[in-house]
């Protein structure tokens, strides 16, 4: 496959495209106008476009299917150049605010949930993506292309703020080289200009890779998919815990460079009769003592044939209240897109079933 122009930072394109100002124009077409082909680049000489087309492609993704939730969540299934498919989610976090005179006082806020791999190696017991196994890493361009495609499809101007969470298909830190390149591309001032502070890397806990990410000093946030407070249950839910146990993860988090004004996010997927009891809440308080942490409780999002169940709302609230009363900042994540195939891997699985 040819590489995409989305695989490169501006300085790299400038080194390969002469005169260099043309590279900057092309960068504008990619990230300000969301060009899908060389033909879209109206002020670029045809000879240069023909030359570039011999070595590069522009668009890497084809929308196979998308589903719109009542809450504004949009789930996308994309086909890659090699025919593999990935999922990306457009999340509406806050509605637009309008005053009595009809003036916008606050723009709507959006987050894009991005995939980093086709499939996943981690094999979490509760995750539908894990059923399909691992196929390959995404390139940096394929990671970047998801954000470009969603901003284009939702008419979201390049200079409007957006947050990125690497919480889609795959383990981000298992594809760290391509992930870090994508992060740097997003940060480009002449591109989308999405700072590290607006990018969150979610990991199931590759403790050695947490250290390496910290050494890269990319300025991103991390979120730890903890989901259990003892190694026995966590190994059941996340088999990789045998190699990267809870203790090693906590120590890696303590070493990670964190903005003193920020907190480390710990994600805790709550599953009925597994980890929703107050005994688990008590252990969680002890586990996170000494860490400037925020706990995000997440309702398990059921899918067909899963043995796990969604917890009761009353149990979620009791769990949250216990953590708050014992000094932890704790939120319950709104269940986005519950009326559509919003759990990771669901839309892909559903579409494949329909085609059979």
Curated annotation (Swiss-Prot):
Annotated Radical SAM core domain residues: 106-339
Keyword tRNA processing on entry: yes
Main location per the UniProt record: cytoplasm
Enzyme Commission number(s) of this protein: 2.1.1.192
Active site residues of this protein: 87, 344
Cysteine disulfide links: 113-344
Residues annotated for S-adenosyl-L-methionine binding in this entry: 170-171, 202, 225-227, 301
Note: Reaction proceeds by a ping-pong mechanism involving intermediate methylation of a conserved cysteine residue.
Protein name, per record: Dual-specificity RNA methyltransferase RlmN
Organism: Sulfurimonas denitrificans (strain ATCC 33889 / DSM 1251) (Thiomicrospira denitrificans (strain ATCC 33889 / DSM 1251))
Gene: rlmN
């Amino acid at each position: 496959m040819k590489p995409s122009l989305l695989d490169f930072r501006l300085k790299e394109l400038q080194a390969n495209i002469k005169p260099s100002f043309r590279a900057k124009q092309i960068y504008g077409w990619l990230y300000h106008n969301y060009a899908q082909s060389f033909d879209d680049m109206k002020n670029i000489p045809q000879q240069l476009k023909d030359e570039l087309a011999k070595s590069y492609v522009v668009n890497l993704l084809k929308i196979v299917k998308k589903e719109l939730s009542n809450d504004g969540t949009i789930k996308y299934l994309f086909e890659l150049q090699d025919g593999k498919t990935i999922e990306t989610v457009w999340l509406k976090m806050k509605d637009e605010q309008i005053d009595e005179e009809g003036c916008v006082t606050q723009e709507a806020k959006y987050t894009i949930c991005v995939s980093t791999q086709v499939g996943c190696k981690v094999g979490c017991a509760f995750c539908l993506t894990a059923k399909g196994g691992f196929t390959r890493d995404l390139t940096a361009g394929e990671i970047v292309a998801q954000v470009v495609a969603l901003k284009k499809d939702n008419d979201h101007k390049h200079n409007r703020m957006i947050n990125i969470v690497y919480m889609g298909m795959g383990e981000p830190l298992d594809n760290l080289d391509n992930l870090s390149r994508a992060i740097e591309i997003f940060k480009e001032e002449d591109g989308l200009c999405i700072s590290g502070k607006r990018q969150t890397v979610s990991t199931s806990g590759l403790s050695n890779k947490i250290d390496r990410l910290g050494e890269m000093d990319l300025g991103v946030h991390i979120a730890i998919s903890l989901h259990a407070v003892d190694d026995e249950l966590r190994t059941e839910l996340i088999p990789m815990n045998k190699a990267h146990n809870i203790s090693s993860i906590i120590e890696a988090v303590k070493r990670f460079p964190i903005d003193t004004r920020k907190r480390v996010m710990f994600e805790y997927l709550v599953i009925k009769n597994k980890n929703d009891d107050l005994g688990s809440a008590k252990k969680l308080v002890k586990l996170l003592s000494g860490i400037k942490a925020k706990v995000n409780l997440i309702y398990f999002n059921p899918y067909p044939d899963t043995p796990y169940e969604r917890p009761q709302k009353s149990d979620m609230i009791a769990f949250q209240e216990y953590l708050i009363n014992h000094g932890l900042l704790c939120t319950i994540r709104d269940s986005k897109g519950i009326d559509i195939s919003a759990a990771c891997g669901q839309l892909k699985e559903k579409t494949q079933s329909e085609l059979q």
